[in-house]
A protein has these predicted regions:
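N-terminal presequence-like segments and the immediate start of the first folded domain
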Residues: 1-54, 58-63, 68-71, 77-125
Length: 125
């Protein structure tokens, strides 16, 4: 098992890694939309969703796989009313066959974020 690190996405100084590579799977910790330069939250559900999915792409590539190999995604939303916008952007990044997925509304996300996504991906053989 190895921890993922990256200088291409914002990484908080907290007691969990960006992700873990274990066996033939990559497990990414939940990603929120922080400006990569400042670490401050990005405004707006569209911009946040784009940033989160872009960060996921980058991290998976650094782990030796791609977003095409995501097998499971969990999306946490501050408001389920944003699901239509999120789905439209999600479809730009994920391709068929789509990964298994859950989307849930939560009462609060860190730093007033609108979205957080965590994924599991298979390593490329």
């Amino acid at each position: 098992m190895r921890q993922l690190t990256s200088d291409k996405v914002y990484e908080l100084d907290l007691p969990f890694p960006l992700g873990i590579v274990d066996g033939n799977r990559v497990y990414l910790s939940g990603r929120t939309a922080r400006d990569p330069e400042t670490g401050y939250p990005i405004d707006g559900i569209e911009e946040q969703t784009e940033r989160v999915l872009t960060d996921i792409e980058v991290l998976l590539e650094e782990a030796g796989t791609s977003i095409d190999n995501v097998v499971q995604a969990t999306i946490y939303l501050a408001s389920m009313s944003d699901i239509g916008v999120v789905n439209d952007i999600y479809e730009e990044y994920m391709t068929e066959p789509y990964p298994a997925r859950s989307a849930v509304e939560v009462s609060d996300l860190a730093a007033d974020f609108d979205i957080e996504i965590e994924v599991v991906a298979a390593l490329e053989e």
